[in-house]
């Protein structure tokens, strides 16, 4: 009817006015972030999407890896950031785009550092430690690494959320691990010290999408910046 046509014309007119004023509709970008990824890493990976000339409206969802992959397969997300690749066994058509890798650093508050005995990594033996939850890819590597070096720290707490683990670490409750690419930021932000590093412990980061060839402008910006900046150090 006439009413629908008038409304449609009104919409078109509003759209053309918006475009003429340079107020084009922002690009929607829906991203899922696995809760095992450090918040600072997630920020550095996602930030380039907001630095594009085009206006972007980003929606971030944090959750467990399998739940996010399910959302991706239903096209409810454009991208999933994770520290593990999606497996073919899952039966979901998704593609892994490697962003980079980082070794791990061991950090603690200066007050705790003063109490540690011996050089790294021997100083970890019997020392209070905060670790990632059992489902984390880094946790499995860490358990193996500690066994290999015959080290038995005193486990004070296990955390799915790295930000919460860092908060306890900052207060001197235990030694904690963090990706080495964040050392400068973590030490400055939390007032903690690096007591040692390991390149045997590696955290990998992936952008997972339903596209084999990346076409979403935000995903293109993220993958480019990760390789050129964050993981180029």
Question: Residue locations for each model-derived region?
Answer:
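Alpha-helical "hinge/linker" immediately C-terminal to small N-terminal DNA-binding modules
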Residues: 1-22
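Short, well-ordered beta-strand segments
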Residues: 28-32, 80, 130, 176, ...
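A late-sequence structural motif
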Residues: 41, 114-115, 193-233
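Hydrophobic hinge/microswitch elements
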Residues: 64-68, 73-76, 83, 135-193
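Flexible hinge/capping segments at coil-to-helix
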Residues: 93-134
